Amino acid sequence: MSQSTATYINVIGAGLAGSEAAYQIAKRGIPVKLYEMRGVKATPQHKTTNFAELVCSNSFRGDSLTNAVGLLKEEMRRLDSIIMRNGEANRVPAGGAMAVDREGYAESVTAELENHPLIDVIRDEITEIPDDAITVIATGPLTSDALAEKIHAVNGGDGFYFYDAAAPIIDKSTIDMSKVYLKSRYDKGEAAYLNCPMTKEEFMAFHEALTTAEEAPLNSFEKEKYFEGCMPIEVMAKRGIKTMLYGPMKPVGLEYPDDYTGPRDGEFKTPYAVVQLRQDNAAGSLYNIVGFQTHLKWGEQKRVFQMIPGLENAEFVRYGVMHRNSYMDSPNLLTETFQSRNNPNLFFAGQMTGVEGYVESAASGLVAGINAARLFKREEALVFPQTTAIGSLPHYVTHADSKHFQPMNVNFGIIKELEGPRIRDKKERYEAIASRALADLDTCLASL
């Protein structure tokens, strides 16, 4: 297939990946037609028509360079990521993590793209894969049925899927502050989480209620298949009595404050279990229940989650929901630039490629956008070094074992190992990997 001679590039979908791709293309002087169906047709999970809307958590996760996603964010900042820049401008307190005011952040991304002179925003549903120009498809895990059928045809079948869930959000003014305390785990960064401590007796009663609560019916006949990073809390609870104690209800590093007077197990300094609440908006009026993605019926959510100390009278401004997320057989279908092996004028980006997480989705859009622009200009494809986070992630999703392919968060395990003797101290090893990654990225960019 010959390269398109169109004078613009299509980007379909204005989520995190599509927004990033559109910006990266436009900043390279190429006109963009950015299609977004929200405003014409709603999705089950989106609440607004803003671009790059966050439908699950409001956290971009760890911000330290000793954390792989922290490294990825720093690499993206050096590549002038619109998602990172607007995220920074709308940060809310989150200890050692990066969390954002979800509405302010999405509104600022939307305004920047809508006001860009080279970006033509078209509010319309696309049901066919365009063949008039180079195209980036970033319609996400909530792709409309009509377009999904065409993408599945490109895939040669129905592809894969998993179920994703979002956590409830509560009104802070309805929390009983006498039963909770402000603290970040291990006192890392500023104290940014409200902690709801549980005694063993409270936890056991909560676990029983959670595992016997009624779930909402699925809209699909297909077998449930969850991504481990966004598993419903009730599914986690059913895996074992202590599973949650090693996950979102882990108490380590969250000792009682000296002035705590609530119930506790004997003289223990640490609760048996802790439920954490994280600020969800800049005003600090909304908090989400960390790690409590759920698919329980709404009435059951209210009944069970009001068993959490401090939330007995909590008002839920949004209940948790679950939805199907689709992703492609990327190892067989895509190159490391997220370009289709079957159609070189076609790129894919976002969670549909098998990257998992807000930051990872935006990163895939950044890579796809840069390379769509380079293809337009008839320049050589840009493959980032495997020593970097932004290079290792696309390499992983396009080289994994197709038979066992699952969505992947960025992590140090997929980044090329350091040369020389192994550094035994994990923190020092991660610091060395990050230092090498940023140096290699700078070298890569300087050579362009």
UniProtKB/Swiss-Prot annotation:
- Extract the SUPFAM superfamilies matched here: FAD/NAD(P)-binding domain
Cofactor(s) recorded in Swiss-Prot or TrEMBL = FAD
The broad enzyme category this protein falls into is transferase
Citing just one GO molecular function, the answer is: flavin adenine dinucleotide binding
Question: Which reaction equation describes what this protein catalyses?
Answer: uridine(54) in tRNA + (6R)-5,10-methylene-5,6,7,8-tetrahydrofolate + NADH + H(+) = 5-methyluridine(54) in tRNA + (6S)-5,6,7,8-tetrahydrofolate + NAD(+); uridine(54) in tRNA + (6R)-5,10-methylene-5,6,7,8-tetrahydrofolate + NADPH + H(+) = 5-methyluridine(54) in tRNA + (6S)-5,6,7,8-tetrahydrofolate + NADP(+)
Q: Which residues of the sequence carry a binding annotation for FAD?
A: 13-18
> Which subcellular locations apply to this protein?
Cytoplasm
Record EC number: 2.1.1.74
Q: Which PANTHER family match?
A: GLUCOSE INHIBITED DIVISION PROTEIN A, METHYLENETETRAHYDROFOLATE--TRNA-(URACIL-5-)-METHYLTRANSFERASE TRMFO
In Swiss-Prot or TrEMBL terms, this protein is called: Methylenetetrahydrofolate--tRNA-(uracil-5-)-methyltransferase TrmFO
**Organism of derivation:** Streptococcus pyogenes serotype M12 (strain MGAS2096)
Q: What is the lineage of its organism?
A: Bacteria, Bacillati, Bacillota, Bacilli, Lactobacillales
Gene encoding it?
A: trmFO
